[in-house]
């Protein structure tokens, strides 16, 4: 049983290593250089929020960015975009994800946005359920295609 709810706070450059480790839980193949992640924490167009347990362990994160281009299913600009949202498995279902999302919502509102958007992989039904449980509505499903081009002679 989890003793007490974690504290939610905005990440600082000193948190980059802990954040990078948590990101591997969501994106196992992520290989973003630590220096790049550290620099991104100073970008006013985005924010990272961490959930920290009483013992100081980081147990979840949420990344949000402002998007000024069109975001599928939205009606305004800019839009806050939830780029990543992850809670360690043993903390899932304890309210940590909702608390992280509340911090993202507040940041997004303070940035002048009227909408918060997100995405997930089509097959990730657990993420779909988490989004719906927190008030997101599905807007559309998209399949991306690519075509390799041969260099011109």
UniProtKB/Swiss-Prot annotation:
Assembly with partners or alone: Homodimer.
Reactions listed under catalytic activity: kanamycin B + acetyl-CoA = N(6')-acetylkanamycin B + CoA + H(+)
Residues bound to substrate: 27, 70, 83, 119, 140
Chain ranges of the N-acetyltransferase domain: 6-153
GO molecular function: aminoglycoside 6'-N-acetyltransferase activity
Keyword Transferase: yes
CDD domains named in the record: NAT_SF
PANTHER family, alphabetized: AMINOALKYLPHOSPHONATE N-ACETYLTRANSFERASE-RELATED-RELATED
Superkingdom to which the source organism belongs: Bacteria
Sorted UniProt keywords: Acyltransferase, Antibiotic resistance, Transferase
Species of provenance: Stenotrophomonas maltophilia
One family name in Pfam for this protein: Acetyltransf_1
EC identifiers of the protein: 2.3.1.82
InterPro entries xrefs: Acyl_CoA_acyltransferase (IPR016181), Aminoglycoside_N6-AcTrfrase (IPR024170), Bact_Acetyltransf (IPR050832), GNAT_dom (IPR000182)
Top class in the EC scheme: transferase
Protein's recorded name: Aminoglycoside N(6')-acetyltransferase type 1
Presence of the UniProt keyword Transferase in the record: yes
Function in brief: Catalyzes the transfer of an acetyl group from acetyl-CoA to the 6'-amino group of aminoglycoside molecules conferring resistance to antibiotics containing the purpurosamine ring including amikacin, gentamicin, kanamycin B, tobramycin, netilmicin, and isepamicin.
Entry's Gene Ontology BP terms: response to antibiotic
